[in-house]
């Protein structure tokens, strides 16, 4: 049976007018008129819009089925597409056949009603929230973002590399990682991430293994052979952070490029962000407008358009600290050189002071990862954080340390064992090259594009501390 989606009906109405079609979907609303005609509002998730189906009482199951339909019921409908006689919709389907595929058990307790539900309420029914307008819009935006990133990276000459989800290495150094080794008694657990070469028979891999916090170290090995590569997949952090900015499981885009320095990757990151925003404004404008209206972020589209035409402002970390220390604003967290900036500082700089995307460069080495290239002052590393109005940091990156002796020193300074990173050190022993990369948090990007205020709404099934219900 040939079926057609609502988005195709809307886009190809001129060709489909007065032709019989078949479509599937779910009932959003049902309205019965005094003229014994029922109007069904049908959606199938292919677009924001629904399709009105006009059902006359001459259908054989009009009394037994049609008049009993409630929000959420699934149906198959056949009929003719025509111009609507009403003013609230452009087209409608005159039904010739309707079959109910699935009823709603006890409609009075169905969690998704026609009223507007709060985002907090919908998090408790994450398995049903895709049926709402807002999460349908977010899902389509996420899909286009995912596809556009792969397309853009391919166009820019990058090769995709799938990096492992299970790893023996800690990319960030001393990160809180999830164990995926088989369970051991506490007395048998190793105290260090790096085990000796002696295998532990109780462990599946013969040594401790973890869920990855980043694919960067692995993808660096491919950058040192293929020049321009990227990985894009799930990452995991076992941090005890119960905020609207943190997830235990999230996705990261991580490009890595050989023969590049910090300034080059800043340009690449800025260009990529603008290309992504441009694509989403072209392909998902209806869904973005709905998000802006639903969340009451009425300046969302203007903010995205302003970003497209903005020039990123560069500022040294040291200068950013001086600026924050001398400004009139009172912060909850004390400002001092050597601190990691908090969200309140990032938002002040990007939203209030500069009112523009900014990149903060050359952070103190003590607050950054071991793999970042040490600057000549021996105090800072060649790092960068891109901040945008609305959310603060959206990209973090650096030039990588390509000098083996300095890398070894940085590992020791971070209390990491060089033997744990033997293969990573090999990249510096065999034809080392300057190389750089960055990470773009996918859910952070979704928040920026949609105007969402809680990152738990940017992922289908959020994983956070003390919460894994689905």
Curated annotation (Swiss-Prot):
This is Asparagine--tRNA ligase. Its EC number is 6.1.1.22. The keyword Hydrolase does not apply. Belongs to the class-II aminoacyl-tRNA synthetase family. Transmembrane segments: none annotated. Keywords: Aminoacyl-tRNA synthetase, ATP-binding, Cytoplasm, Ligase, Nucleotide-binding, Protein biosynthesis. One of its GO terms (biological process) is asparaginyl-tRNA aminoacylation. One of its GO terms (cellular component) is cytoplasm. It catalyses: tRNA(Asn) + L-asparagine + ATP = L-asparaginyl-tRNA(Asn) + AMP + diphosphate + H(+). It is an enzyme of class 6 (ligase). The keyword Protein biosynthesis applies. Its main location: cytoplasm. It is found in: Cytoplasm. Homodimer. InterPro entries: Aa-tRNA-synt_II, aa-tRNA-synth_II, aa-tRNA-synth_II/BPL/LPL, Asn-tRNA-ligase, Asp/Asn-tRNA-synth_IIb, NA-bd_OB-fold, NA-bd_OB_tRNA.
């Amino acid at each position: 049976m040939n079926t057609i989606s609502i988005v195709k009906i809307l886009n190809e109405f001129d060709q489909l007018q007065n032709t019989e079609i078949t479509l599937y979907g779910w009932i959003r609303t049902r309205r019965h008129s005094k003229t014994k005609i029922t109007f069904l509002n049908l959606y199938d998730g292919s677009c924001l819009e629904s399709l009105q189906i006009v059902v006359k009482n001459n259908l054989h199951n009009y009394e037994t089925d049609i008049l009993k339909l409630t929000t959420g019921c699934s149906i198959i409908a056949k009929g003719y597409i025509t111009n609507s006689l009403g003013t609230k919709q452009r087209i409608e389907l005159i039904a010739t056949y309707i079959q109910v595929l699935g009823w709603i058990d006890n409609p009075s307790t169905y969690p998704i009603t026609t009223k507007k539900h709060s985002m907090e309420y919908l998090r408790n029914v994450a398995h049903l929230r895709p049926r709402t307008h807002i999460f349908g819009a977010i899902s389509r935006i996420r899909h286009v973002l995912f596809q556009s990133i792969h397309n853009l990276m391919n166009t820019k000459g990058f090769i995709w590399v799938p990096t492992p989800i299970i790893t023996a290495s800690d990319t960030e150094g001393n990160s809180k990682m999830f164990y995926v080794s088989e369970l051991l008694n506490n007395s048998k657990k190793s105290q260090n991430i790096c085990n000796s070469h002696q295998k532990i028979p109780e462990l599946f891999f013969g040594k401790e293994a973890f869920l990855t916090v980043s694919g960067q170290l692995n993808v660096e090995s491919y950058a040192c052979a293929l020049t321009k590569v990227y990985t894009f997949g799930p990452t995991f952090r076992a941090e005890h952070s119960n905020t609207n900015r943190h997830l235990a499981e999230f996705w990261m885009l991580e490009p890595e490029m050989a023969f590049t320095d910090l300034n080059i990757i800043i340009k690449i990151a800025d260009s990529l962000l603008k290309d992504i925003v441009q694509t989403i404004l072209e392909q998902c404008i209806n869904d973005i407008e709905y998000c802006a209206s639903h969340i009451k972020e009425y300046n969302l589209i203007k903010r995205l358009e302003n970003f497209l035409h903005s020039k990123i402002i560069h500022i040294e970390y040291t200068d950013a600290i001086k600026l924050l220390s001398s400004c009139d604003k009172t912060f909850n967290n004390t400002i001092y050189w050597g601190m990691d900036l908090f969200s309140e500082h990032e938002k002040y700089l990007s939203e209030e002071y500069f009112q523009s995307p900014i990149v903060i460069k050359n952070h103190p080495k003590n607050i950054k990862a071991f793999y970042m290239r040490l600057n000549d002052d021996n105090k800072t590393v060649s790092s960068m954080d891109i901040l945008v109005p609305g959310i603060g940091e959206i990209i973090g990156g650096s030039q990588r340390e390509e000098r083996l002796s300095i890398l070894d020193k940085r590992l020791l300074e971070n209390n990491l064992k060089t033997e744990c990173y033997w293969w990573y050190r090999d990249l510096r022993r065999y034809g080392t090259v300057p190389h750089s990369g960055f990470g773009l948090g996918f859910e952070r990007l979704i928040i920026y594009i949609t105007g969402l205020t809680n990152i738990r709404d940017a992922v289908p099934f959020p994983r956070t501390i003390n919460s894994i219900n689905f």
